[in-house]
Amino acid sequence: MTVLSRACSRCIAQAATSSSARLGTTSRALSSSSTRLSSPPADPKAIAEAFLSKFSKGQTFVRRQLLDANQIRLFSLTLNRAHLWPTSSVSSTKTLEEAEPVQGTPIPPAYHLCYFTPAQLPGILGLDGTDASFNPDAPFTRRMWAGGSCHWPGADPNAVHQALLVVGDTVTEVTRVLSCEPKVIGKTGESMLVVGVEKEFRNGKDELCVLDRRNWVFRVALDPSKPAPLVPKPKELSQAELDKSVEGKLWREYSRDEATLFRFSGLTFNAHRIHYDKPWATEVEGHRNVVVHGPMNLIAMLDLWRDEASVFRGVGEGSMQDDEAVYYPQMIEYRATSPVYGREPYRVMMNKEAVDKKEAETRVVSNDGTVCMKGTVTDWSLSK
């Protein structure tokens, strides 16, 4: 086992090259990028094999961190949630604007993403601001968070003891590389590499609380000196079409502004410029505006599910916090399929009957009808 000290972190970064994205965007966002590549064609298979050879001994990289109350407080407020957990009596509980969560408060599903953020000196970051941890060699340095899964093995509501990440605990993150596979984007014929990474999060008692598997897509780097064609904005659905699209569904609508994206970037220490630098996002990477973080959409799907599932099950009485509904899924599998853009409304939705099912299909759908993220939330004990 390797402890990820400052020196070790630097070695990993220098063994890789700069990346260009840390969220789930898709091939359609830069479908014409093949004319703007910064490097000549390379052998994806050879680069994948060279990347895996760096981790062929199965080494792990370990970090430890205190889950402090202020970080999770600011993170929840940035997501416009005044409480970490849905409450049955808001009047009896102070909001996060008024007070930090007390020690021992469980961290909601996927909110662990505000901890264990990238830790690199500025000179090691890519030109686009992204960190270079666990990257393949050039030219495959443009990273996108394409999907993955999160499991909460210690959150079984029927267990005598639950192993959860909680505020005030010192937690250990264990990271390992699982895979690196060459792929081809069907629409463009462009080569890419798909890297699988696994992160374990263990509490102070060394109990596994979260198993977080992430799939990163690495595409060929773009040449910033060559202008990018913008992604056209599709026509939004009419109000009648929007109303019809949510019939029989539980849903919420969002339109993320630049301030929200900037705060989310700061709290996750994500310096990728597509989230806050509009000229970079539009002129270099070809987006039509700044891009909403993929993890923000993942959390939105989980927030919708846990709020509705908690109400349906009557969770709250006798839970760890007065009047708070503490309820976790068993797991979620998710995949980003298209970017979500700042100041463009979109909806997170799932079928109403899904709260009474073992598996709940969740979707992030732009108001022009584009499906931007898909997820399947698995409950603990309900029948299919």
Please tell me what each predicted stretch does.
Residues 67, 108-116, 143-146, 150, ...:
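Long, contiguous hydrophobic alpha-helical segments, chiefly transmembrane helices and signal peptides
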Residues 1-46:
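N-terminal mitochondrial targeting presequence
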Residues 6, 32-61, 147-256, 336-384:
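HotDog/MaoC-like acyl-thioester-processing domains
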Residues 76, 114, 118-121, 176, ...:
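Residue-level recognition of well-ordered secondary-structure positions
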Residues 18, 32, 73, 77, ...:
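A broad, structural surface signal
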Residues 281-354, 367:
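Catalytic-pocket segment enriched in acidic/His residues
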Residues 28, 32-172, 313, 317-324:
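Hydrophobic, proline/glycine-rich low-complexity stretches
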Residues 40-102, 106, 231-300, 304-310:
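A contiguous, surface-exposed recognition patch within enzymatic or periplasmic domains that forms
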